[in-house]
Curated annotation (Swiss-Prot):
<dbReference type="GO" id="GO:0006367">
    <property type="term" value="P:transcription initiation at RNA polymerase II promoter"/>
</dbReference>
<feature type="domain" description="Histone-fold">
    <location>
        <begin position="141"/>
        <end position="216"/>
    </location>
</feature>
<feature type="region of interest" description="Disordered">
    <location>
        <begin position="1"/>
        <end position="84"/>
    </location>
</feature>
<dbReference type="InterPro" id="IPR007900">
    <property type="entry name" value="TAF4_C"/>
</dbReference>
<keyword id="KW-0805">Transcription regulation</keyword>
<protein>
    <recommendedName>
        <fullName>Transcription initiation factor TFIID subunit 4</fullName>
    </recommendedName>
</protein>
<dbReference type="GO" id="GO:0003677">
    <property type="term" value="F:DNA binding"/>
</dbReference>
<dbReference type="Pfam" id="PF05236">
    <property type="entry name" value="TAF4"/>
</dbReference>
<feature type="compositionally biased region" description="Basic and acidic residues">
    <location>
        <begin position="239"/>
        <end position="259"/>
    </location>
</feature>
<feature type="compositionally biased region" description="Low complexity">
    <location>
        <begin position="21"/>
        <end position="39"/>
    </location>
</feature>
<feature type="coiled-coil region">
    <location>
        <begin position="207"/>
        <end position="232"/>
    </location>
</feature>
<feature type="region of interest" description="Disordered">
    <location>
        <begin position="230"/>
        <end position="259"/>
    </location>
</feature>
<dbReference type="InterPro" id="IPR045144">
    <property type="entry name" value="TAF4"/>
</dbReference>
<comment type="function">
    <text>Functions as a component of the DNA-binding general transcription factor complex TFIID. Binding of TFIID to a promoter (with or without TATA element) is the initial step in pre-initiation complex (PIC) formation. TFIID plays a key role in the regulation of gene expression by RNA polymerase II through different activities such as transcription activator interaction, core promoter recognition and selectivity, TFIIA and TFIIB interaction, chromatin modification (histone acetylation by TAF1), facilitation of DNA opening and initiation of transcription.</text>
</comment>
<keyword id="KW-0804">Transcription</keyword>
<keyword id="KW-0539">Nucleus</keyword>
<feature type="compositionally biased region" description="Low complexity">
    <location>
        <begin position="296"/>
        <end position="305"/>
    </location>
</feature>
Length: 363
């Protein structure tokens, strides 16, 4: 395409206007560059000659000599920091006496040590003088742990020694009270209440109605037994006392006694011949046997006569001692009834024990 002369003239005008507008910017740029060059030249001129020479030669600059450190100033500053007089002055100005505070602290430490020593000595004395526990800690802790687990509690009771000691002491006190009540009930069971006679002032223990009835029954039984024995004597089934005395006079009883002694002597002699190594007694000799045997027979006869004199006719025939007074089998001991009576007074947690006790009494 070919441009017209008018268009070319317009383009020239636009170029001229753009150059006129950019001329002040160019001037400012040139001015700034000239200012920078002048500042660089002034800085370069201010540098020392030695530095310029080393830079031009290509070698590294020599190190400058180190300035000496003043140690006196450092030590003085440390002494100032550690000066106790100034610190004391500041504390004294605050109203605090350091020496008095140190003495108080020292006294407190001594008192604390002495108190700890006394406490340890006291604990050792208490442990040495303390009696062993009534219940063993291991078994008691195992029993409490079993009951606690049944109620949903998980705890190690063996670690708590004070609790175990308290429970052991409580059990000991409860059992001692129970034993005391049992002894009191046993005494009341065996003894009546003494009745004091107002006229004479004497006291007597009345017998119970049961003991009176038992004694009357025993007397009746004795009378019936005597009647029965008399009937047997009359019928000739048993020998009377007169027949027994006649036999004694005739020597039948003596002959029987001598016969038994002879048998016993033969048995001992046979035993000694079978075992000759055994010890021999003096009465086994020929001289001692006769005398010993005769003396023994006489003594036995005398004792039988004496016993016959003291015994009643029916007792001598029957060989019975007659009526005996009733004696308590238990004596002064404690029986199950006493213990059950003491347990019933507790009324708390003793139901199963009472049931088992009465079941044993029934058996």
């Amino acid at each position: 395409m070919t441009s017209t002369p008018q268009e070319s003239s317009n383009l020239k005008r636009q170029l001229e206007n753009s150059e006129d507008s950019s001329s002040p910017n160019k001037k400012s740029k040139t001015e700034t560059t000239t200012e920078n060059q002048s500042s660089w030249e002034s800085d370069f001129n201010s540098l020392p000659v030695e530095l310029l020479q080393t830079e031009t030669n290509g070698t590294s600059p020599a190190p400058a000599p180190a300035t000496p450190i003043d140690t006196t100033n450092v030590s003085n500053s440390k002494e100032r920091d550690q000066d106790t007089s100034k610190l004391n002055d500041a504390i004294a100005a605050a109203g605090v006496d350091i020496q008095q505070e140190e003495e108080i602290l020292l006294q407190q430490q001594l008192n604390r040590k002495s108190a700890e020593g006394m406490a340890s000595n006291l604990k050792s004395v208490i442990r040495s003088s303390k009696s062993p526990p009534f219940l063993h800690n291991y078994h008691l802790a195992a029993f409490i742990d079993k009951v606690a687990k049944q109620n949903g509690i998980q705890q190690n009771f063996l670690m708590d020694g004070e609790m175990l000691e308290l429970i052991s002491a409580a059990c000991e006190t409860w059992l001692s009270n129970l034993a005391t009540k049992t002894i009191i009930l046993s005494r009341h069971r065996r003894r009546g209440i003494p009745v004091i006679n107002k006229k004479s002032g004497s006291s007597s223990v009345p017998r119970s109605e049961i003991s009176k009835e038992l004694r009357s029954l025993a007397l009746k039984q004795k009378e019936m037994e005597e009647k029965r024995v008399n009937k047997r004597v009359m019928l000739g089934l048993e020998k009377s006392t007169k027949d027994a005395s006649k036999n004694d006079e005739n020597g039948e009883s003596k002959a029987g006694a001598e016969e038994t002694l002879h048998r016993a002597a033969n048995a001992t002699a046979a035993m000694m011949t079978m075992n000759p190594g055994r010890k021999k007694y003096s009465w086994m000799t020929s001289s001692a046997t006769a005398g010993g045997g005769s003396d023994f027979g006489k003594s036995s006869g005398g004792s039988s006569k004496d016993s016959g004199k003291h015994q009643s006719p029916i007792i001598s025939v029957r060989g019975d001692n007659g009526l005996r007074f009733r004696e308590i089998r238990s004596g002064n001991s404690i029986i199950m009834k006493d213990l059950l009576g003491a347990i019933e007074d507790e009324k708390m947690g003793t139901r199963n024990a009472v049931i088992k006790g009465y079941a044993k009494l029934k058996d």
